[in-house]
């Protein structure tokens, strides 16, 4: 059996989606495959491949006890053991055949922060029947927007309302999308650490109304100058409330247009809205060589 889940990009609502802000999320054209087959080895053979079809992780677990017989990474194998154990609490026969071969394959660079964990969780959920949001909450305590993107065929609005998930698929495909680019900052952020830090520092009610209002205005936006004004306003709010420096001020203060951080600030991808020419050469001159136009990354 083979399963696939989309990666994700959070356009608005980073951090504040955790506390109930209405947020705009976009599934990506990249994702992760999970293929499972049985054998007679009494072993769970797990192999993970990167986008170049090279092995980046491998382990062997006893199918019953989940004792690690071999692992190329103790940290990763412990996470996999915990995932399997938790799923077995809900579905006792999960991976209890005579043995299993499990292969995962990313179609994006695993350092890009597009959801290597959420796509894995969603794929395991499809196979096991266990609720993916329950798995996600147990292991990552995130908002769940990434799980919503995993099976979505379009952009979506996402909100947590009294811990209930409100998801609405929308068509976010702005007419000026040829002026929008995603740039990788050559650094992967630790989502778990960022979530923990935010929850400890920020009052649960602060910023929700303002961020939600910007999201509503962005999805209706027809004009690039208005869009730029809105993402600038979004950056100002997040910067003020989290005491984090805006990425444009820090790295790109001479950029002709506006820039918005996506997800945890300081790494992964940013969104650039260029007023004039294609900004690829500009970002490459600054040392950032991964520049994708909107349609190259967003599933539209």
Report the location of each language-model feature:
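DPxDG-like acidic metal-binding loop motif
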Residues: 111-133
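Acidic, glycine-rich active-site loops and adjacent beta-strand->loop/helix elements
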Residues: 106-110
């Amino acid at each position: 059996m083979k399963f696939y889940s989309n990666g994700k990009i959070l356009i608005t609502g980073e951090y504040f989606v955790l506390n109930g802000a209405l947020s705009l999320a976009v599934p990506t054209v990249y994702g992760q495959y999970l293929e499972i087959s049985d054998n007679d080895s009494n072993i769970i053979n797990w192999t993970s491949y990167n986008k170049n079809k090279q092995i980046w992780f491998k382990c062997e677990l006893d199918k019953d006890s989940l004792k690690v017989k071999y692992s190329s990474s103790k940290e990763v194998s412990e996470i996999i053991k915990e995932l399997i154990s938790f799923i077995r609490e809900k579905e006792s026969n999960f991976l209890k055949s005579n043995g299993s071969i499990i292969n995962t394959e990313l179609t994006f660079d695993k350092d890009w922060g597009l959801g290597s964990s959420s796509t894995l969780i969603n794929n395991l959920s499809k196979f096991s029947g266990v609720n993916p949001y329950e798995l996600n909450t147990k292991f990552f305590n995130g908002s769940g927007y990434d799980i919503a993107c995993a099976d979505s065929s379009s952009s979506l609005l996402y909100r947590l309302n009294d811990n209930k998930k409100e998801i609405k698929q929308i068509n976010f495909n702005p007419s000026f999308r040829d002026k929008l680019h995603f740039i990788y900052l050559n650094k992967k952020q630790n989502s778990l650490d960022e979530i923990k830090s935010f929850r400890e520092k920020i009052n649960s009610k602060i910023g929700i109304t303002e961020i939600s209002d910007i999201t509503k205005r962005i999805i209706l936006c027809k004009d690039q100058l208005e869009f730029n004004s809105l993402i600038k306003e979004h950056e100002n709010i997040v910067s003020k409330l989290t005491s984090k420096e805006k990425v444009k001020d820090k790295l790109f203060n001479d950029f002709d247009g506006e820039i918005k951080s996506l997800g945890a600030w300081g790494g992964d991808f940013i969104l650039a809205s260029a007023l004039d020419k294609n900004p690829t050469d500009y970002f490459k001159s600054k040392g950032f060589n991964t520049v994708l136009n909107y349609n190259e990354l967003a599933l539209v």
